Amino acid sequence: MPTRDAAETTPDDTLPWYVAPLPTRLEDLALRLAWVIAAINVAGTVFGFWYYRIQLADTPLAAWIFVPDSPMATLFIAASLVAYKLDWDADWLHALAFFGCLKLGLWTPFVQLVVNGQGALWWGMYWFLVLSHFGMAVEAFVVHRYATFSVPAVGVALAWYGINDLLDYFLGVLGGPHHTLLRAELGADAPHALYAHDIAAACAVALTMLATYLALATHIHATEHRR
């Protein structure tokens, strides 16, 4: 089965730095190691579902897909890289991967460092969560090398993560909360009334907006360059 490599994916030097902040050499390296990075993300997905096992046990089955946001993001990027290597037409998947890795890659470190703190969590696990999620944000900025971020594809990603935000922070349906439980929310009678919840919600919505802007900006700049 034919596959693609980094040499077939020419970087667009016209893109502004804020949509393509990584050095081209780093992008090329990531694309050459796409299979390895996809495998690492699959492993991260498995670990992530294990990490959420306690919260999932208390969540109705119908809402499970909305709870493990980070594992879903690593699953999206793994599938996106596989689709890239096999030259599949899956721009909607690439958009989901970009949104997920950027959003969760920045939301989790922010919440851990600013809202949660280490608490009783083992320091090794704490910093693993922070740094591994930063890595997700970095790999998000490789996706533009093979994605077009078409308007319909961005619409799919915006719908998915917009619905996630609504269910996680604003609509108490399906036996929530569905977001990653914050330390301040453990044992709380009304977790959505806490200030920590408001901060986490604001960060999530802002990052969904940021991902939408960056994806559409990438699409617009690339389209203008091709004219």
Question: Which role fits each region the language model picked out?
Answer:
Residues 146-227:
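Terminal transmembrane helical module of multi-pass membrane proteins
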Residues 44-87:
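Selected alpha-helical membrane-embedding segments in polytopic membrane proteins
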Residues 97-163:
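Membrane-proximal helix-loop-helix units in multi-pass membrane proteins
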Residues 5, 71-84, 134-145, 201-219:
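Hydrophobic cores of alpha-helical transmembrane segments in multi-pass inner/ER membrane proteins
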Residues 48-57, 109-120, 166-174:
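Juxtamembrane "helix-exit" motif on the non-cytosolic side of transmembrane helices
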Residues 1-33, 52-61:
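N-terminal juxtamembrane cytosolic/stromal segments of multi-pass membrane proteins
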Residues 30-45:
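Alpha-helical transmembrane segments
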Residues 24-28, 83-96, 145-152:
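Membrane-interface helix-boundary motifs at transmembrane edges
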